[in-house]
Structure formats: structure tokens, C-alpha cells
């Protein structure tokens, strides 16, 4: 029986409870085939079809994926426009939330029926200097969900038992799915900005899948939030999520001066989640002296440009932030479990994934799309 409340479990509304109880029924009988979306070449047709159910390796768990968030990285994996080679054929997806249905022979700490999350980092060696220092994402042998390892755009997927995220019973799996990548990523980026309560942080791309969560995490961490995006709909969402000042880049005549005026000297930190090369470089101009620019979004073949004299005289920092480790994941999920983060999601069937990619390519995504693997 699914528990609806524990000491640290987020309250589950009756409708959400009903949705979960229907989706979390017995998974004892594991089928041989399943529905999934697979492509055989970059930018090739996205096939929604029957594919084999994978068998977990000794160190892996098999997860019956109920919902999966759709991330801009999934689009890059399909396009093949990053310098990192992608596995082909490939099942994308790396924000999968579901139920553990089978354990590999060496797995400890998990049991069938547990709720689990599939992250971007599917597995790492856990023995190199990066893994030992908490930088598992930088492991040279990192295995990446939906990129080098078939991901969560299928009904059953495998994940390394050490890296898989533990999700509390009673959690709405549709809403928690985006936290597994988008939430963890922006939470870690905010930590990298090294801010204190009351500081200003600018979120570039504030109303997209990453930005909408970054606004909430920043607010929950006690920061004042300035959002940069375009359009009235996005401004309304930004304000609804707790943002304070919104800058519409299509309307402002001088973004640098407008941002610096609104924040009385510039934000102490900037989180770049947009995929605009120009926006990234501009952030080095409006950030406050001694402030930190954090790079998160990954536009293909892009460079960040910072004028050297100003960079030195203003003593600004430019840092890259790449998802998060297991501790970051636990912390990000805890914010969600305490009701401090709401995922602004739209649920569609897995079969509609090509339509979601089309919207993403056109820049028409508001919040986060989540696919239901049963449809």
C-alpha cells in the first residue's frame, strides 16, 4: 500500500494519490517487451515502438519508469551536436521516476517496490580522484542516461544502484521527475555561485524547464531573484514562482544598465540556463564586481567572451557547473519533499515526444514537459 504521509513526505493531494496508486500497482510480472522511443541515427526518425526490456547487470536495478521529464539535453543527444559521441541506436531520457522491479545480484540498499529516479549520471567508477572527492559527474568512465546508456523514454530502464536516486514513498512521480536533472542541476549551480541570503541572483532563461526550477530554489535559499526571458506568459510564470524583477530581453533597450539599476550594482551571481551564446557573454558585463557567473546551458559550439580588462578589474568569476553529485541530489529532493519546489509540468504521452522536441526547437516550452510512459 502506498503511504501518503511520513515525517518528511510531501503532502499528496487526493488526485495525485489516485494517479500514483493507479500507476504503482504490482509489477511482479516483468514483460519481455515494452513501449519506448528510439532513434537509429542522429536527427533520424523517432520511433515509438516495441523494444526489449533490458536485463539489469549485477550492479544495477531495473526500474519500471512511470514518468520522465524532457530536457534540452535530450534534444542535443538526438541532434548529435555535442562533441561527446552518443550511443546509437539510443533511447533518450534522463529524468525518469518509477518503481524498482528487479535487483542485480550485487545490489544492496534497495528492495523491489522502492521508488527510484534515473539521473543524467547513470553510473561512475567510484574509485577515481573525481568520484572520491564528490565529483562523480567528472568521472572519465561516467555512464550517461539517455546518451551513452539507454534512458528513461521507455517503460523499463536500468540504473547503477549507487547512482540511482532514492525517492520517498508517497511522492508524486510526475512532479518529481524534473527534479532528477533540472532541479539537481540548478540547485548545484546556485551552490556554486557561493551566495548568501539577501544577495541578488539573475536567472538567464528564467521561465524554461531549468529556469522555472532555479527561480524556486533561489527563493527557497533566501536570494532575491531577477529573471531574464521574453513574453508576458513567461513573466507571469516567473512572478508566480516567487521571482522579484523580470527583464524582457525583447523590450529592453539596454539590458546591462537595466539589470544593474534593478539590483543596485548588478547581481551577485548569474545562473545561465539559456542556450544563447550572446546572453552568456552579456552576463559577464552586468554581474556585480566580485560576483560569479555560472554556466549551465550548453549551446552547441558556443564560447563565453569576457573583456579581459573588466574581468580583472571587476574581479569576477566564471564557473561551469555540471549537474550534481549524490549529496546534491538528496538535498534537491529534500527541498521538493518539504513543499518548497513545485514542478510547473505539462504531462503528455510518451508517444508525443516528437511534438515536444518540435516545441523545444522553436523555443516554445513553458515550464517542463513530462511524458507518461503508459501512453
UniProtKB/Swiss-Prot annotation:
SMART domains: PKS_ER. Zn(2+) 1 binds at residues 71, 94-95, 181. Binds 2 Zn(2+) ions per subunit. Its main location: mitochondrion. Mitochondrial isozyme that reduces acetaldehyde to ethanol during the fermentation of glucose. Involved in the shuttling of mitochondrial reducing equivalents to the cytosol, where the redox balance is restored by NADH dehydrogenases on the external side of the mitochondrial inner membrane. Shows a high affinity for alcohols with a double bond conjugated to the alcohol group. Present with 11600 molecules/cell in log phase SD medium. Homotetramer. This is Alcohol dehydrogenase 3, mitochondrial. It comes from Saccharomyces cerevisiae (strain ATCC 204508 / S288c). The lineage of its organism: Eukaryota, Fungi, Dikarya, Ascomycota, Saccharomycotina.
Amino acid at each position: 500500500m502506498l503511504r501518503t504521509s511520513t515525517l518528511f513526505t510531501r503532502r499528496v493531494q487526493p488526485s495525485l494519490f489516485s494517479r500514483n496508486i493507479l500507476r504503482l500497482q504490482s509489477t511482479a510480472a516483468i514483460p519481455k517487451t515494452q513501449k519506448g522511443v528510439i532513434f537509429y541515427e542522429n536527427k533520424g526518425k523517432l520511433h515509438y515502438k516495441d523494444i526489449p526490456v533490458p536485463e539489469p547487470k549485477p550492479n544495477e536495478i531495473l526500474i519500471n519508469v512511470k514518468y520522465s521529464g524532457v530536457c534540452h539535453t535530450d534534444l542535443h543527444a538526438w541532434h548529435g551536436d555535442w562533441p561527446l559521441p552518443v550511443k546509437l541506436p539510443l533511447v533518450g531520457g534522463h529524468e525518469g521516476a518509477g518503481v524498482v522491479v528487479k535487483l542485480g545480484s550485487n545490489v544492496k540498499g534497495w528492495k523491489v517496490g522502492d521508488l527510484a529516479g534515473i539521473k543524467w549520471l547513470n553510473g561512475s567508477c567510484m574509485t577515481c580522484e573525481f568520484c572520491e572527492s564528490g565529483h562523480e559527474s567528472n568521472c572519465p568512465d561516467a555512464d550517461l542516461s539517455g546518451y551513452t546508456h539507454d534512458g528513461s523514454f521507455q517503460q523499463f530502464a536500468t540504473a547503477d544502484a549507487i547512482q540511482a536516486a532514492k525517492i520517498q514513498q508517497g511522492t508524486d512521480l510526475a512532479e518529481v521527475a524534473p527534479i532528477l536533472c533540472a532541479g539537481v542541476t540548478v540547485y548545484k549551480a546556485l551552490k556554486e555561485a557561493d551566495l548568501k541570503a539577501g544577495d541578488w541572483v539573475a536567472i538567464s532563461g528564467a521561465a524554461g524547464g531549468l529556469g522555472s526550477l532555479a527561480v524556486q530554489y533561489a527563493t527557497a535559499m533566501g536570494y532575491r531573484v531577477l529573471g531574464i526571458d521574453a513574453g508576458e506568459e513567461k513573466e507571469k510564470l516567473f512572478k508566480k514562482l516567487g521571482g522579484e524583477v523580470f527583464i524582457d530581453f525583447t523590450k529592453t533597450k539596454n539590458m546591462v544598465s537595466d539589470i544593474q539599476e534593478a539590483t543596485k550594482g548588478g547581481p551577485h551571481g548569474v545562473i545561465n540556463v539559456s542556450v544563447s551564446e550572446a546572453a552568456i557573454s552579456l552576463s559577464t558585463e552586468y554581474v556585480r564586481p566580485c560576483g560569479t557567473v555560472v554556466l549551465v546551458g550548453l549551446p552547441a559550439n558556443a564560447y563565453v567572451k569576457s573583456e579581459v580588462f573588466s574581468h580583472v578589474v571587476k574581479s569576477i568569476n566564471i564557473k561551469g557547473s555540471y549537474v550534481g553529485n549524490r549529496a546534491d541530489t538528496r538535498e534537491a529532493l529534500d527541498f521538493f519533499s518539504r513543499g518548497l519546489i513545485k514542478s510547473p509540468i505539462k504531462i503528455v504521452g510518451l508517444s508525443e515526444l516528437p511534438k515536444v522536441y518540435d516545441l523545444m526547437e522553436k523555443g516554445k516550452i513553458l515550464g517542463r514537459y513530462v511524458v507518461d510512459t503508459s501512453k
